Amino acid sequence: MSKKMTLAVEFSLMNQESQIEETKGTPHGEGPVPFFEANVKTRVLLVASGKGGVGKSSVTTNLAVALSKRGNDVAVIDADVWGFSIPRMLGITEPPSVVDDMLVPPSAHGVRSISMGFFADEDQPVIWRGPMLHKALNQFLTDVAWDEPDFLLIDLPPGTGDTAISIAGFLPDSEMLVVTTPQVAAQAVAQRAAFMAGKVDIEVRGVIENMSWFTADDGQRYELFGAGGGKALADKLGVPLVGQIPLVPTLREGSDNGNPVAADLSTEIGAIFSEIARVVEEDLKPSKRRHRELKIN
């Protein structure tokens, strides 16, 4: 008989400044976040977007799988509490198990994951405000037996807000990848997420452009959402354009069916994600650990 799992949430009121102070690596006096320690090898990658609908979660999922295919130990936290989708995209149907009062995250395609999707019905909304969200994120970090993966990807909700503030405090050495589309309007909105990262001292490492083009059956390439948005954003932020991902039916189908396209390196889209993973792992190596103190202007 499986043990029933609950996600405990403590209610408290705090302003933004207090919330940031509370999250500096030692949330609520419960001990340090595992990935906060200076000698931990794990690279924490926040995957962000300015708006919904740009394919951020599918990029997170497939990047995680691609990093795993390169021989890395990879974990994903689905921090998009209101719009969780990582379990479906990875094809995970079993909930976490419980061993010694710790959650053991389920795994698929070489990627371990934790998500609100394991604790809430997929068709039911999660109606939470800041303090509840903050506590849940704390538990995702401290009450899960992560060990020490090479990469921890955190799928942030679109836009800016409490989730980003909490994660920035828990994990101030995180790196951020910003997902956008070629549309100028999407690029402008994504820019806000990047500027938010600067406010909380998170380093933006690169931009990933999704839905860059569509190749028709006749081999003609069509730029359905315009062109240049990803490059323009990368140039404005002074970071590289890490990769461009085409609009292909298999990407959507794989996300719906739990079969990430990055698992098949023989396909064009699989090879594209593999190259993005290589760039992230090799070309965007962290230079050094930065100071711990947050700068909120």
Language-model region placement:
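Phosphate-binding loop that captures ATP/GTP phosphates
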Residues: 70-128, 134-136, 141-142
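C-terminal-of-GTPase-core extension/linker across diverse P-loop GTPases
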Residues: 267-290, 294-297
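Residue-level signature of catalytic and energy-coupling elements of molecular machines
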Residues: 41, 52, 78, 86, ...
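Extreme N-terminal, non-catalytic leader segments
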Residues: 2-51, 277, 281-284, 288-289
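Walker A/P-loop phosphate-binding motif and the immediately C-terminal alpha-helix
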Residues: 43-80
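Conserved catalytic-core segment of NTP-binding enzymes
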Residues: 143-146, 150-256
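C-terminal boundary of histidine-terminating zinc-finger modules
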Residues: 257-269
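Hydrophobic anchor at the start of a short beta-strand
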Residues: 7, 73-74, 204-205
